[in-house]
């Protein structure tokens, strides 16, 4: 209400423009406000975190959290322009880099085996902010995401593959009351392992795929993200939070 009232008090109209400068939350809120203000005004997204540049700024999803779950209130609304400048990333901590890297790895797993092979060799360079590797990874991630978005804008089927890792991830975040102790990216990294293990049990993927993913985690000191959620008790504690996930169809 505060943001909407601010626009109204300044006499914004449908020919005006909202500019978002910040991370994923900033972009989500700005996009959602732009989508409902006078039934929609234009907005530009300038993401300043790696996570936002490779994921939330691309695809037109906007959303806010509620006490019942993550991103349960939102809309599909495309920005007129997205500007990703890698110089913003120079100030990010390793924890923030891991956040964005999780989505980069996810994109490689769901779509591009050659990109995955490249990440097996270059993940360390990305986390160390080497500009050449970082720029390539951002561009490649955006191309993969837009491949799915352009074919299923409103997430009726194909686009749902972009949620790989996120069912368990959102449950982990809710269970931990969205604590800063575990970031979205860390939760996604955990979720991808749990969901790959489940896929192996259901004979959807092979043990070799799981081991290759785990090897990337091990080599880049990311195994901590899933180890504390790998026992039966921890997984059982997540089940109640899976039931209200917005991706459920039954």
What are the roles of these predicted feature ranges?
Residues 1-44:
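N-terminal small/polar loop signature for handling phosphorylated ligands or for N-terminal nucleophile
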């Amino acid at each position: 209400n505060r943001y909407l009232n601010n626009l109204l008090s300044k006499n914004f109209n449908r020919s005006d423009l909202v500019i978002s400068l910040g991370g994923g939350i900033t972009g989500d809120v700005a996009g959602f406000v732009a989508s409902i203000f006078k039934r929609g005004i234009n907005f530009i997204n300038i993401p300043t975190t790696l996570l936002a540049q490779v994921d939330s700024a691309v695809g037109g999803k906007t959303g806010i959290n509620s006490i019942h779950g993550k991103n349960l209130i939102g809309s599909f609304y495309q920005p007129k322009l997205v500007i990703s400048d890698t110089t913003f990333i120079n100030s990010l901590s390793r924890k923030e880099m891991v956040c964005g890297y999780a989505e980069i790895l996810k994109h490689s797993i769901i779509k591009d085996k050659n990109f995955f092979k490249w990440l097996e060799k270059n993940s360390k360079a990305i986390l160390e902010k080497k500009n050449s590797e970082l720029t390539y990874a951002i561009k490649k991630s955006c191309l993969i995401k837009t491949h799915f978005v352009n074919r299923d804008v409103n997430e009726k089927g194909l686009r749902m593959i972009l949620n790989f890792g996120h069912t368990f991830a959102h449950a982990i975040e809710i269970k931990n009351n969205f604590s800063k102790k575990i970031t979205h990216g860390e939760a996604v990294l955990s979720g991808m392992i749990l969901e790959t293990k489940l896929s192996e049990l259901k004979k959807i993927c092979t043990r070799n795929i799981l081991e290759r993913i785990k090897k990337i985690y091990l080599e880049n000191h990311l195994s901590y993200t899933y180890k504390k959620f790998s026992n039966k008790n921890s997984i059982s504690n997540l089940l109640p939070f899976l039931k209200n996930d917005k991706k459920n169809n039954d």
